[in-house]
Amino acid sequence: MAKAKFERNKPHCNIGTIGHVDHGKTSLTAAITKILAETGGATFTAYDQIDKAPEEKARGITISTAHVEYETQNRHYAHVDCPGHADYVKNMITGAAQMDGAILVVSAADGPMPQTREHILLARQVGVPALVVFLNKCDMVDDPELLELVELEVRELLSKYEFPGDKIPIIKGSALAALEDSDKKLGHDAILELMRNVDEYIPQPERPIDQPFLMPVEDVFSISGRGTVVTGRVERGVIKVGEEIEIVGIRPTQKTTVTGVEMFRKLLDQGQAGDNIGALLRGTKREDVERGQVLCKPGSVKPHTKFKAEAYILTKEEGGRHTPFFTNYRPQFYFRTTDVTGVVHLPEGTEMVMPGDNIAMEVHLIVPIAMEEKLRFAIREGGRTVGAGVVASIIE
């Protein structure tokens, strides 16, 4: 049978399965593709095909991630599933697979476990907007009261990490029953019920092009007789010739007007998310702008020096540090296009951080950088990556 061509006319959404090891994340991923394949919305991908996930590199870190795609009545989905716990931590922190929402898989037989808690915390820290819960292996639990107890536990845990625990949809079912066609209610029907909830409960992400304009500065040239041209890839939004923008980061914020946009040496009337452009800036001197700043819609992004972050520190085998670090550690933080030195303050009770740890920390940069929550960065020492992080909240 020929592979069905995915229609791109449906809104797109990125999701993933998260949860404790062996609670059934990969089985559920396989089950979703199986059930949706019945209506032509997917190609069935078996468990063992998903489980041997290829390795990818993101921000200098190797991560194993499996990708499947499928569609429901309403949306087209790209779905990520990771084989190991460390891969989830790295994936969520580096944003290698951006998640607009996630399906938290909890085994009804075991209830919430340590990684269930850790994945919920990570989802909160890295800014995953919404979770839907699949209570898996319900065919192994005969006592309905026990199921209710597990559901209550999951809701309490979600609320503890500031997700709306009492509102989040929890679907009871069995991925195995769906894969083996053994119990229609817990298998087939539960998967469809899950996808209906994912469709309705996970908000449709705003497309990059609809967000306020932002472009990281990669290079600055001065063109005699024309002025200063700044090049970079537009991260989001649209910039039109004649619009006012701000130059933010490193030094005091400046306002200027874009008097020209070019791409591949051709003049355009606008540049948009994904385009590599050169922007001609009115009355701006070559020395007024530098790599590491951003051009943005006025007032949309502010420069900051202090923030809380969630970070993953590479192991020695991954090319990271061989030794732990302590509070007042001073590496470089690579934001978008440049390194800035910063000082790390560890939370109370954390003496040191070992290679391979993930950690919440406070960072004070020596110069301000245009930043907002969810912005990713690399932690570097002399140009080599020793960690990755994400801005969890801004202090000042």
Swiss-Prot record:
Residues 81-84 are annotated as: G3. Residues 174-176 are annotated as: G5. Residues 10-206 form the tr-type G domain. It is an enzyme of class 3 (hydrolase). It catalyses: GTP + H2O = GDP + phosphate + H(+). It comes from the Bacteria. Pfam families: GTP_EFTU, GTP_EFTU_D2, GTP_EFTU_D3. Residues 136-139 are annotated as: G4. Its main location: cytoplasm. GO terms for molecular function: GTP binding; GTPase activity; guanosine tetraphosphate binding; translation elongation factor activity. It is found in: Cytoplasm. Belongs to the TRAFAC class translation factor GTPase superfamily. Classic translation factor GTPase family. EF-Tu/EF-1A subfamily. Monomer. This is Elongation factor Tu. The gene is tuf.
